[in-house]
A protein has these predicted regions:
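Substrate-recognition "cap/lid" segment bordering the active-site pocket of phosphatases
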Residues: 111-164, 171
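Surface-exposed amphipathic alpha-helices with a cationic face
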Residues: 85-93, 146-147, 151-158, 178
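Short, acidic loop-to-helix structural element flanking the phosphoryl-transfer center
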Residues: 72-100, 104-106
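Short acidic-hydrophobic, aromatic-tinged amphipathic segments that line or gate anion-handling sites
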Residues: 122, 198-205
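Acidic, Mg2+-coordinating phosphoryl-transfer loop and its flanking beta/alpha structural elements
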Residues: 98-103, 162-201
Length: 215
């Protein structure tokens, strides 16, 4: 019987970079147009619409087809936080199921999950045709859908949402914080800091928080 479920966001939580999407925009020379984020936030476009727009902007700015290798190169400089392996190992040794639920990009999130050895990893998938990036993909973790996804994940392991931990860092994580039993925000976390049960500067603090809740 597992001790519980601990779900991590990826960008800015397990990595030093706060947005893999922003990383791609900067690499390919496009503007990360906040206008489309606002349209999504207002429920005027879907997350897949937003993905298509972002990718189209990147391709247009790059001025030539973007290959899978280009995307891999763009994301290769994003590093996993130094303390992350120690924390994930300690949580797994304590019999917690460790999952990542990220609205980031599969090529990065898969690498992070593989290197850290997490139990389950959910993310959005880019679309390639003959190794060429095309607008589209699979929006498996839309930002607004995170509360539902985390709840369903807990239920799949027969773990109460009230016994579930969620670790995030942005305004998009606030609704998840409100729904889980234990919420942890990782600095810098902006307005999300005010909605979490715990706020940490170093991931290693999570070990003490989890151990303390078991006493």
């Amino acid at each position: 019987m597992p001790s519980g479920l601990i779900v991590f966001d990826c960008d800015g939580v397990l990595t030093y970079n706060h947005s893999s999407w922003q990383q791609l925009h900067e690499y390919f020379g496009s503007r990360d147009n906040k206008y489309f984020a606002e349209l999504y936030e207002r429920n005027l476009i879907t997350y897949l619409d937003w993905m298509k727009i972002d990718i189209a902007l990147m391709i247009h700015s790059w001025g030539k087809p973007i290959k899978r290798r280009d995307v891999e190169n763009a994301l290769s400089t994003i590093r996993i936080k130094q303390e992350a392996p120690e924390v994930i190992r300690a949580l797994k040794d304590a019999d917690y199921i460790v999952a990542v639920v990220s609205s980031g990009i599969d090529i990065l999130v898969e690498r992070v999950c593989r290197e850290l050895g997490v139990d389950l990893c959910l993310y959005n998938k880019l679309a390639f045709h003959n190794d060429e990036l095309i607008p589209g993909g699979e929006a498996l973790v839309p930002l607004r859908e995170k509360p539902r996804i985390v709840k369903n994940l807990a239920e799949s392991f027969s773990i109460s949402i009230h016994d579930t931990y969620y670790v995030g860092d942005s305004k998009w994580d606030i609704e998840v914080f409100r729904n889980v039993g234990h919420s942890i925000a990782v600095k810098p976390c902006g307005e999300a800091c005010g909605f979490a049960e715990h706020v940490v500067s170093d991931l290693r603090e999570i070990i003490g928080i989890v151990n303390g809740s078991r006493v």
